Amino acid sequence: MSDPMIHTITETDHIAYRRFSGNGPGIIFLAGHGSDMEGSKALFLEEWAQAHGQAFLRFDYRGHGQSSGSMDATNISDWTEDVITVIDELSEGPQILVGSSLGGWLMLNATLLRPERVVGLIGIAAAPDFTEDLILAGLTDDQRSQMQSKGRIALPNPYADEPVVYPYHLVEDGRGHLRLRGTLDIDKPIRLLHGMQDAEVPWQTATRIAECASSNDVRIHLIKDAGHRFSEPQQLDLLQQVISGLVADIIASGDQKSRLP
């Protein structure tokens, strides 16, 4: 595979991305925490978009994949800035944001900041507020004290032998982006896919998003035997159905451009 394109932010910071031209609305994939743009869902959506002539973009947040920086030194604010950079500088016209896990949080942040550019949202095991509701809430008092005093904590990683390390500044920064504490001023079509066997992000998070969002066009798809990764063939088939339906709805509403770069 060819090297990704590089978008320079500063002398030391850059975002790696892959972009394909097509019809509007464009689709931007937002990966999960610790994941990158080469994951199965990103590649599946890219293949679908190319087959249907839809504009598509996937990228790595700073501290992830082939972008600059380290995950330990970046946070929700940084990754939200990366999504905004991609929307403002690497895409044109209306966009559908597809967010997986962490990406489901960032898509909410980005929509609040760029409501004129986002025309639809799809969350896959979306995890808004996970720093507070999942990481911090899951710690004992001793672990919380340790996290504060040492500046980080290492927890078991369900997908690898090495633990996942969460810096305390990630929790502190996350408090400025909590979205499920009141009304979420997003009046866009929202589609939420979640597995009921998700051991990382409870499926009830999807219902909380639906309850908080001001939009009445919110649909939740719960899959009883699906886990957090949501990457099995039947789960990807559902994702295909949902993205196809949302694109069709947006085109029917006239809220799109005919062709995007």
Language-model-derived ranges and their functions:
Residues M1-S21:
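N-terminal cap/lid segment of alpha/beta-hydrolase-fold proteins
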Residues G104-P115, L121:
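Short glycine-enriched nucleophile-adjacent loop
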